[in-house]
Amino acid sequence: MIKQAIEKVVNHENLTFEESEAVLDEIMNGEASEVQTASLLTALTAKNPTIDEIAGAAASMRSHALAFPETKDVLEIVGTGGDHANTFNISTTSAIVVAATGTQVAKHGNRAASSKSGAADVLEALGLDINETPAVSYESLQENNLAFLFAQEYHKSMKYVATVRKQLGFRTIFNILGPLANPAHPTHQLLGVYDETLLEPLANVLKKLGVTNAMVVHGRDGLDEMTTADETAVVELQDDHLTKYTVTPEQFGLKRRQRADLVGGTPEANADITRRILAGDHGPQRDIVLLNAGAALHVAHPALSIQAGIDLAAKTIDDGKAFEELNRLLAFSDKRKDVVA
């Protein structure tokens, strides 16, 4: 299959969903050579992958992932990375705030690739066990409304492309597959992307993958998040319909900030920023978390406007519930470590 797929893509022909899924199956099963894998990835990058090609590849990744117990109405807050902004862990902090409102969040993430601190790095620095089994993570989702699914534990088949990706050295389809391959199969998703041209295609991919409500966002300062330093371009998926619009921080009563105010550092430094935000510190870092948490709450509960989501996120922090959520997660993690020990 991969030989035919390479020939097709080299000739600027598109693969169907089924063809893309089948060829990724070959790669994920270790049946393709590194030369073949590199050829396909290079040809896809040169052509630009279509919605069907991305969705088929994501479906393959999901099917090869470690199984996660079935969930219902679960939210994911994630970015593609690759914006080279070195911000603190905005999505992860926002996920904790959203979980504290009683909304279930299955956060799928990894260690840092293009930044200094990925979701796994900062959660580990906060004191959480990032290597929990699917059963334990599911238990955390039910008890604490938040589960972390460590990508490298769930996607063992990625070992077949790791060397090729590193040696190619440029972005490939795999740079956008990670946020689409959550084994918890979220039905609601806030997805940040590094390039505005990805907004509509990835919204359509999410639709094909069974997501019912989503916002795909790109900060015009370059962030793969909702940003407080510039406008944010949005494509929203709701009721099978896509809507494009732009938002500014000012329309939600938030100050426009400098991107330098949002820069993080090491996992330990970012963990400290997260703790301070959850404990109620005010300032630029809180504001961007409120904006992203508010958008995520709107995605999870469409009847709630983004503004109402921001207000709920602020109240959740100010009432101490967000910090309580972090402490619950830490206590749960410690308890499970003791059981294993």
Curated annotation (Swiss-Prot):
Its cofactor is Mg(2+). Pathway: Amino-acid biosynthesis; L-tryptophan biosynthesis; L-tryptophan from chorismate: step 2/5. It comes from the Bacteria. It catalyses: N-(5-phospho-beta-D-ribosyl)anthranilate + diphosphate = 5-phospho-alpha-D-ribose 1-diphosphate + anthranilate. 5-phospho-alpha-D-ribose 1-diphosphate binds at residues 79, 82-83, 87, 89-92, 107-115, 119. Keywords: Amino-acid biosynthesis, Aromatic amino acid biosynthesis, Glycosyltransferase, Magnesium, Metal-binding, Transferase, Tryptophan biosynthesis. Anthranilate 2 binds at residue 165. Mg(2+) 2 binds at residues 224-225. It is an enzyme of class 2 (transferase). Its EC number is 2.4.2.18. It holds the Pfam family Glycos_transf_3. GO terms for molecular function: anthranilate phosphoribosyltransferase activity; magnesium ion binding. GO terms for cellular component: cytosol. Mg(2+) 1 binds at residues 91, 225. GO terms for biological process: L-tryptophan biosynthetic process. Binds 2 magnesium ions per monomer. Catalyzes the transfer of the phosphoribosyl group of 5-phosphorylribose-1-pyrophosphate (PRPP) to anthranilate to yield N-(5'-phosphoribosyl)-anthranilate (PRA). HAMAP family: TrpD. Belongs to the anthranilate phosphoribosyltransferase family. Homodimer. This is Anthranilate phosphoribosyltransferase. It comes from Lacticaseibacillus paracasei (strain ATCC 334 / BCRC 17002 / CCUG 31169 / CIP 107868 / KCTC 3260 / NRRL B-441) (Lactobacillus paracasei).
